[in-house]
A protein has these predicted regions:
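Core SAM-dependent methyltransferase catalytic element
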Residues: 183-203
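A short acidic, Gly/Pro-enriched loop at the edge of an enzyme's catalytic core
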Residues: 94-106
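A short SAM/SAH-binding and catalytic strip from SAM-dependent methyltransferases
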Residues: 104-117
Length: 203
């Protein structure tokens, strides 16, 4: 399993992370009309790559992560930038509810498959989303476990049909999914392609 605190300092040096975020941001902007007064939350924001790419589109983005070193890197990047819209936040939404504010948009990329209870976290997303807001989740399509390999205790991607059912059960009305990126990773059997979907749900 990935130790995100140890990975934080070298995270941005892997170009695939930026390439993936660019593809997700592009697909999102093609499918959703974002208004400049909207605020957003990025769940499992890591070092904030996606939020930095989308900062100019929102009034503010709260970058939430439960790994303290990831949040430290985020803060350093914010301090070194001219952006006043990005707000790093150390918080674990899998363990407690967040009642400080509500959001017009919730973003998450490659974080959901690390969360043990998918239904609980989707319900918490719904609870902090404003009416007419949207949830955008980018994650792995269902795979055979080779993406993370032996010892990983999260989800081996998601069957999008089943995930859409969880969304609707939580209260989301419209749910649409597209493949937005492909990652290639080396496995013991050689290079393998892993599709990444972007699911957008509105309440």
């Amino acid at each position: 399993m990935t130790d995100f605190n140890n990975a934080a300092r070298s995270w941005d040096s892997n170009s695939i992370h930026a390439q993936r975020s660019e593809a997700i941001a592009r697909n999102l902007l093609e499918r959703v009309q974002i208004q400049p007064e909207m605020n957003a939350l990025e769940f499992g924001a890591g070092t904030g790559i996606l939020s930095f790419m989308l900062a100019d589109r929102f009034s503010s983005i709260t970058m939430m992560d439960s790994a303290s070193e990831m949040v430290a890197v985020m803060q350093e990047k914010v301090d070194g930038s001219s952006s006043k819209k990005l707000k790093p936040l150390l918080f674990d939404l899998t363990k407690e509810t967040y009642d400080v504010e509500k959001f017009d948009c919730i973003l998450s990329q490659m974080a959901l498959h690390h969360v043990a209870n998918t239904e609980v976290i989707i319900s918490r997303f719904f609870g902090i989303l404003r009416k007419e807001g949207f949830l955008a989740i980018a994650d792995l399509d269902a795979e055979d476990g080779s993406f993370h390999g032996a010892g990983f205790d999260g989800h081996n991607g998601f069957d999008v049909v089943e995930l859409e059912k969880i969304m609707r059960k939580a209260g989301f009305r419209s749910v649409q999914t597209e493949i937005c990126f492909h990652m290639t990773k080396m496995t013991p059997e050689g290079p393998k392609d892993y599709p990444i979907f972007l699911m957008i749900a509105t309440n």
